[in-house]
Amino acid sequence: MDNNIQRLIDSAKQSLNSPESYKYIDESFESCIKCTACTAVCPVSRNNPLYPGPKQSGPDGERLRLKSAELYDEALKYCTNCKRCEVACPSDVKIGDLIVRARNNHLAQSKKPLMNKLRDAILSNTDVMGKINTPLAPIVNTITGLKATKFMLEKTLNISKKRTLPKYAFGTFRSWYMKNALQDQQKFERKVAYFHGCYVNYNNPQLGKEFLKVFNAMNIGVMLLEKEKCCGLPLMVNGFPNRARNIAQFNTDYIGKMVDENGIDVISEASSCSLNLRDEYHHILGIDNAKVRPHIHMVTPFLYQLFKEGKTLPLKPLKLRVAYHTACHVDKAGWAPYTLEVLKKIPSLEIIMLPSQCCGIAGTYGFKSENYEISQSIGKNLFDNINEGGFDYVISECQTCKWQIDMSSNVTCIHPLTLLCMSMDA
């Protein structure tokens, strides 16, 4: 007993003597009232008996982890970071953040299998993979679509052979913008900055072009940050917090430079990127982004505000029946009502809001062999609702939700910006 007490005292002294510790202290777990509302809404708990749930892995586990660093748990890896636990929590405990930080600490202390570590590095370093693959996109896309390739990826890197891998674009959005759009954007008096992220840059430049089209139609020009990197979310949740922290500081610095020099807001069309840039950089990584945080926006709430200011779009009737899927991080941030109000501007459009539930992919989570079946089980009810609803499209702001829905249902998932452009072109 005396040894345990002395160990607690030594640990406390070490923390007090470390300035770095103050950045990451999160005492929200003390507010947990043990109501288990978080566990009731957790999509993983319902589908994976090995996961004890967010209450035990989060606030309950944090109390134990403060006593002994040896009490980190392998079950932490099952959390998808969907944050539905945080939405449900009546005490505003940052349950998902607690689990992500604990998981990163656990991975730092444990010996992850070499091939899994390589797999996680490949899935997490999106800029590196994008720069390698976009110049060779036609070849890469053909090779990664082969059954033999998928078989080898599962046997070597534990990437599920059942997962449809994302396709790369032949050329990046950023290079297209510099060659074809930069000069035209200078003519607009009012401007916004666009954080395009890795998905638009390497996988879907067309979505970035649609971003420009919508804002230009509102007489607003679009600038790019001088430099940007992937928001760092894949690194943050896969056990590379130091690398994620460096990227977060890099992006925060360049967002700050844009705000200081031009006094304009920075917009992202991606829900998880927006949440990460605005909230998680500080909550999880300890980055001081207080100066730039008010200037970081998700695109649909920003468009909603523009409509409130009197801005308009030349929208024409679309006689379509579409389903709106509330992505997990959209639910966490409370952005869904704004997206729905923006889409209601499209004449003749029928919008059905699907029950809010996780699609299961959770970024890189659903690509891993050990998670694939759980991922699909989590999303099954959603896929059934989509397939049985008679929809022309599913709408979502989340790119990985799009990958999951496109692969697992009979209906194509598109971004709200794409639907707005369809209406403008009708």
Swiss-Prot record:
Pathway: Polyol metabolism; glycerol degradation via glycerol kinase pathway; glycerone phosphate from sn-glycerol 3-phosphate (anaerobic route): step 1/1. It is found in: Cell inner membrane. [4Fe-4S] cluster 1 binds at C32, C35, C38, C89. The gene is glpC. The keyword Acyltransferase does not apply. InterPro entries: 4Fe4S_Fe-S-bd (IPR017896), 4Fe4S_Fe_S_CS (IPR017900), Cys_rich_dom (IPR004017), G3P_DH_GlpC_su (IPR017753), Helical_ferredxn (IPR009051). GO terms for molecular function: 4 iron, 4 sulfur cluster binding; glycerol-3-phosphate dehydrogenase (quinone) activity; metal ion binding. This is Anaerobic glycerol-3-phosphate dehydrogenase subunit C. [4Fe-4S] cluster 2 binds at C42, C79, C82, C85. GO terms for cellular component: glycerol-3-phosphate dehydrogenase (FAD) complex; plasma membrane. Electron transfer protein; may also function as the membrane anchor for the GlpAB dimer. Composed of a catalytic GlpA/B dimer and of GlpC. Keywords: 4Fe-4S, Cell inner membrane, Cell membrane, Electron transport, Iron, Iron-sulfur, Membrane, Metal-binding, Repeat, Transport. It is a peripheral membrane protein. The keyword 4Fe-4S applies. Residues 21-53, 67-99 form the 4Fe-4S ferredoxin-type domain. It holds the Pfam family Fer4_8. It comes from Haemophilus influenzae (strain ATCC 51907 / DSM 11121 / KW20 / Rd). The lineage of its organism: Bacteria, Pseudomonadati, Pseudomonadota, Gammaproteobacteria, Pasteurellales.
